[in-house]
Structure formats: structure tokens, C-alpha cells
Amino acid sequence: GYDTKFIDLKPGKKNDNLEVLLKPTAFEISEVVVKPKREKYTRKDNPAVELIKKVIAHKNDNQIEAKPEYQTEVYEKLSLSLDNFNPNLDKNKFLKKFKFIKNYLDTSEFNGKPILTVSVRENLSDFYYRKSPKAEKTIVRAKRMQGIDKTLDDGGGITSNLEEIFKSINIFDNNIPILLNRFVSPLSSTLATTYYHYYIMDTLDVGGDKCVDLAFVPANSESYGFTGRLYITLDGNYAVKKVLLNTPANINLNWVDKLRIEQEFKQMPDSTWVLDQENTFVNFYVVKGTQQLYAHL
């Protein structure tokens, strides 16, 4: 509002086109805190819980590990970068001599800040699997290293840390090992519905398949569980089309600050689903307090 203002009008004189300037009313607003109403989570008659139960019941029918045996070709590309890199090279007397560095700049998946890729490692291999007796074998056919990766490839330090981070995971297992810790899978046959809260968010198209977007969070935010999304097909097979896994910010993973895993699956002619694409992103330190590194597989 505005402060009240009185103006004297003189009779016998023109008073049209009169401009009156009003001063806004000055007032203070005390601090206002808005808190959303916290709804109680219930598992009974919860469509999200019923959906995840059906996904778990069908997981052995849909995953390729249910087959007696299979083999596949695997291509992996691991890039290691300096995180939160300042792209303004002109202010750095040393780096401004190397203008080509800008060609190796990328963007972090975590915060959108620039990163500088310093090494790239590529592997091409054949993977063999047998269900009973269970056996797995990987034969490397070709490998290539670029950048400072050869310096790091000493069987220890950064190399061993990266190997520990990027160990292959199976979302359908009851437990998923991450850095010597065992995380409960959101598809665990034994603990899923008691360990996690599930929420149906939306229906959407994922790679040509209509899916339910199912969000999940640990019931206890300090437990070793993931936050993320499951995209479940709506064709009656309850197959996992895509999964996003994030480690919670308030748990201790030693030298790892952030970790995200993305997997996307495709259906084969025999109706089983196989892993088609996988991306793992991680922020970590070699030594706490030093330059943070960013890795992407």
C-alpha cells in the first residue's frame, strides 16, 4: 500500500492533469517458514509397493542370468578428469601456453561445472557366463590408454581405487557391493519393501517402451541404500527398462564423495532383457583435502 497524502486544491484554478506522487508504506515482515505437511508412508494398499512386488516376482523371468549360458562382447571406456577445473586459461601463466586444453573440457554430471579430462582407458573384451555350475570368464581382446593413464597404471593408488569403484554390479541381486560395503538392492527379494519407500511419479516413454517412473529412497536416510528411479515396462512383463542409483550424501564411503550408476536394458527376441548401456559417474579424492577427481565409465 501507500502512505495517505493530502493536497489542497485552489478553487477557480485548473486542477486537471495533476500528478500526485505517493510514497509506499514501509513495513517489516517477520521471518516466515513454510513446511510441507509430512504424509505418513504406508505399505498397505500402496500401488507403488504392489508394483515393486510384481517386478521382483518377475525378475528371474526377465534377466538374462536365468538362461543356462550366454556370451557377449563388452566395450568399456573409462575417463579420468580434474573436477571443477577453471576454464579461464588466460589468467594462468602456465596453462595459457596450452590453448588446446580447451578441447578436452567436459561437464560434470553432478554439478554442471567444467572438468578437464587427463586420461582415457578403453577395453574390448568377451564375457562368458554359465549358470550351473556358476562360472564367469572375461577375455580381453584389446586395450588402449591415452593421457597420463600409463603413469597411473602401477597396480596401486588411483588405478586400484578405480578398479574397486567400477566393479560390475547386478541390480537384480539382493545386495550390491560398493567399496567393501553391501547396499540393499531396490529389487531385493528379501528386504526391498521394508528397506525402501517407493513412489509412483509418472508414466513416460523410455527408448520406445512405455514405462512407470518409480522413485525410491531408503526408509532410514543413514542406511546403506540407494536413492534413485526404476523405469518399469507397462506391457505386463514388469521388466526393468532403466535404473538410476545414487549413493546418499550423508553416508561415509571413505574417499568417494558422490557416486551415480545408470543402467539401461533392451529386450532380446527370446523375451529376456539384457544390459545395453551402463554409465557410472564418481567424484573422489586420492587424499582428502587434495584436488578432487571425476571419473566416468
What are these regions (language model features)?
Residues 43, 183-191, 198-205, 209-297:
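Gly/Pro-enriched, hydrophobic low-complexity segments
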Residues 2, 15-17, 29-31, 67-69, ...:
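Extracytoplasmic
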